[in-house]
Amino acid sequence: MLLLIKYTLLYGIVLMLVALGGMFSEHSGIINIALEGIMVIGGVAGVLTLTLLPAGMSPFLVVLLTILAAALAGMVYSLLLAFASINLKADQTIGGTALNLLATAIAVVIAKSFSDSGSAKLNYCNKPFLFSIGGLELSVFVPLGIILLIISYVVLYKTRFGLRLRACGEHPQAADSVGINVYKMRYAGVLLSGALGAIGGMAYIVPPVQTWNFEVGVAGAGFLALAVMIFGQWKPFNIFGAAMFFAVFKSLANIADSTFLAQLHWSSNIYNMMPFVASMVILAFTSKNSMAPKAEGIPYDKGSR
């Protein structure tokens, strides 16, 4: 049971962070399909920072600097999507897909450049990111994720910034008519998405293991986070619940060998497929009631009203 709780929290926080990132982007009117790639970029930036920091540095500084590095890398990478979608008015789905493909290639090149073996694997120490409560090992991303969840809710619903952001995703022409700079708000939404997605990527890669092969990217976690965002109806606390729901399915592959599930003698691939199958089934039944921002995916042209 402790193992199930451990992995559910581990994966649930990852999915929640990335889905919250997608939520900010889509509330501004930009569909961020590039979450998968942003996770990879955040992961490789965080791991690289972790390996380059001097030995003996305090664990708090290690955690702080690596998370900041990941968030900054994610924001910089998300600027590519923002520029293509907002300034060039490119198709957001195609642009995001291209960035997903590019991210893995970039991560592999970087990893091979810093790997002693010349492979795409990087070794690192993840001990600063782990702590125990009553025999339950958790990562620092669990409390950080809860804090960011609360902050996201407050920012989105209790601040002028959040009101303006949502206005740009619902009716950008009306927002512009009252003096809101739609372009700046959409850039802000995508940048927030990049930061949260990158932190989520680092949370996915660093705590569970001490070696990561960047050729596998993040194994579809970014796309699963998109399903979490849709199932959560673009609302922070709904997203948290949806993330934990999908995380239970994703956790089964990690605990199958040590629980009664081992008696079924199923391949781990079956358990790895479960969250994706569940997402398709759930979205098939709930997509009709979707409350997506009305202007998401539609390039804004100030001259057309």
Where are these regions (language model features)?
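Cytosolic-side transmembrane-helix boundaries in multi-pass membrane proteins
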Residues: S152, E170-K184, D257-R305
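Hydrophobic core segments of alpha-helical transmembrane domains in multi-pass membrane transport
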Residues: V18-A19, G43-V47, T104-V108, V142-V154, ...
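Transmembrane helix-bundle core of multi-pass membrane transporters
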Residues: Q92, A103-K158, T259-I270, G297-R305
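Transmembrane alpha-helical segments in multi-pass inner-membrane proteins
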Residues: W212-F276
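Helix-loop-helix "hairpin" substructures at the membrane interface of multi-pass membrane proteins
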Residues: E137-N213, P236, G241
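Alpha-helical transmembrane segments within multi-pass membrane transporters and channels
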Residues: M57-L102, I147
